[in-house]
Amino acid sequence: MEDFLLYSLYTILALLVPLYLYLLTRKPKFNKSKLPPGNIGWPVLGENVDFARGGPRKFIEERMSKYSSQVFKTSFMGEKVSVFCGPAGNKFLFSNEDKAVTSWLPRSMRKALLFPSYVDVPMKEVGALQHSFLHEILKPEALKKYIPVMDAMARKHLDAEWAPFEEVKVYHLAKKYTFALACRLFLNIEDPEHVKRLADPFARVMNGLFSIPLDFPGTAYNGAIKGGNKVREELLKIVTNRKKELVEDESSAGRDLLSRMILVKDEDGKLMNEMEICNNIVGLLVASFDTTSCAVTFVLKNLLELPHIYEKVYQGKLIV
């Protein structure tokens, strides 16, 4: 048995080593377009290892210093990318959406987040209706309706998860709160156990989403793939059940984002199917899981480190 395993290992190495050497030594075919300075790293691995080892800040600062403070090229998750830095880069990106640039995600990320039949569909088509919904739910009139819910959930969360303890992990608890709030506002889900059925696999997705895209058992990326399958399975059940509820009782429409997504029609009068709705919901949940949680964590960190700012915020809260 040991001889067989050893022979199998030698066979695999004999096949993989020449392929790796070929990828390492071949001359890439570049087009005539001028590319920014930088390095795309190792074949397949790209610069994922350096990114994971040093963290985002160190990784970006080193390359800004070495190559350019405005833009540099690198390779993440099997994709060659350009990283824009500073105000000029941000202005260019955000003022040229659907003009000079378009929304895009690496294929490895799409594979973890979307249904298989949508992995190769342009992101513009996958989230075609999301922008109109975002504008709708972020309008001042809409935000007024959310504030009582957000306030009540925040108080309940602080009483249960913060008050009983002398020390807490802010980032972890911020993610727990913002994800539960997203489930409440987007899906009208309040049951903690139901939220947990979505949060646990979603955490696996986020933990492996930016890892090296090797889909082998035991890798972080494989965990992201499995977590994504579970999230989509759970969301599909929620969407299907909500559709049945709306058929039986149309008066329940409009109480949350999901209900409006089910009923909205595109320019051709066509409704979104269940998988399209799930894809859009996943995009919103991704934003709620990390981005908002990071903002909350840094706000609390700065208030702790700057007591004079904290005092002004506190006094302002008392006035309100």
Give the residues covered by each predicted segment.
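Conserved cytochrome P450 catalytic core segment spanning the I/J/K helices
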Residues: K139-A142, G227-V296
